[in-house]
Amino acid sequence: MEKEQTGGAETRVTMNNYTKEDIIRLVDEEDVEFIRLQFTDLFGNLKNIAVTASQLDRVLSNKCMFDGSAIDGFARIEESDMYLYPDLSTLEIFPWRPQQGKVARMICDVYRPNGQPFEGDPRYVLKRAVQQAEDMGYTFEVGPECEFFLFNTDENTMPTTNTHEQAGYFDIGPLDFGENARRDIVMNLEDMGFVIEASHHEMAPAQHEIDFRYDEALHTADNIMTFKMAVRTIARRHGLHATFMPKPRFGVNGSGMHINMSLQKDGKNIFQDASDPNGLSEEAYYFIGGIMRHIKGMAAITNPLVNSYKRLVPGFEAPVYIAWSTTNRSPLIRIPAAADGEGTRIELRSPDSAANPYLTLAVCLSAGLEGIQEKIEPPQSINANIFALSEKEREELHIDQLPGTLLEAVEELEKDTFIQKVLGDHIAGKYIDAKRKEWHEYRSQVSEWEIQEYLYKY
């Protein structure tokens, strides 16, 4: 339901500018029976309230109320009434549902009864950061690279980590057992207006990647949530379980969500400067500097799970060290080659797909903007394989490390008052408390590794 707009070297996807009357007409003409009002909780989980088409007038008048105290991290029971305000531009009809009695969705913002945006709504946090960029004359554009696994299910259709395939990077069928499911996912996403640039098998058995066209930050965050929902739904129809868990299997590559970022001003990519040896402008360098200053404090957002830090280890093409480069993939930040200056972008390689995309893009943008405002110079680029450097060599080059555990990441977030301010007091406090609880629950568990390692010996 989105339209492609051709301009320059790229074809971009534009948002729909639906009115209430358009929505009512489309729901009637398309025989839509149910409308899902979707929103995202603090931890990146998609939630929804389903209403019938007969309730559309109430929905479009922003009168759909729900109990915010039932959503983790939202509100206390004594102030729990919340309202869903649908973003009309996000209306989409699910292509995988029956053609009679169709199901559509609209993504919603969360508001308090007094008509004020709810400060605990992650979408509002990103909107606030985007507004700051717009006040500076910038448009923040983002292209994600979403990786996931397609695993078998058991006889009760419950998910497992089993797969019968041994396919690797760029392999095709019959080695790639998930090829049919991946193709079906792509076709359904295209029916929903996605522009799919590439899809392929990834490094690990049963691991896949689908890349869709860059867009403005809010639309991209919405698309990431839609993408994850569609991938899981279509995979299940193929008898598979799709997971965005960062490291579901030991000894193989984990799944990341690399974030490609650029800033536009007056329709031009301001990260590009043909006169610079690296093709980068001052703003691009400062943006890198801002992210590198705050990346430790951002880690609990970009890598939110205990399991996230089992991906961020040497040997599996995931970043561990805080550095940037134009020539290799071992650092945290890479500057991909661009055929023309308009494609110049900054690739942040640490985030994973378990992250809340609204909060992730908000902290990335805000850190980068602070870099521009304060003219934060990044350190010298590192064009060597950082994993091949000795500890002494890394110290001499002043190369720091990302947090090694969720606990370390939470402690870094507690120290970074700037990132806390970006999130807001409500989200920062609730998030830190929840992640500390998650860590303490994890550390009290007894793993299979411990049983195998210690039970016989001791």
Labelled PLM ranges:
Residues 1-198, 220, 240, 397-458:
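ATP/Mg2+-dependent ligation/transfer catalytic cores
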Residues 34, 46, 103-107, 143-147, ...:
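Broad gene-expression machinery/nucleic-acid interaction feature
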Residues 141-152, 159-161, 192-212, 242-262, ...:
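Core alpha/beta catalytic barrel or barrel-like domain that forms the active/cofactor pocket
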Residues 173, 177-181, 198-204, 216-227, ...:
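Short, contiguous, pocket-lining structural segments
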Residues 42-47, 114-115, 150, 205, ...:
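Flexible loop/turn segments at secondary-structure boundaries
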Residues 162-172, 205-220, 249-254, 266-271:
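Active-site-proximal beta-alpha loop/turn segments in soluble metabolic enzymes
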Residues 3-4, 226, 233-236, 240-241, ...:
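Catalytic-core signal marking the mid-to-C-terminal active-site face
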Residues 41, 111-117, 174, 214-220, ...:
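A generic structural motif
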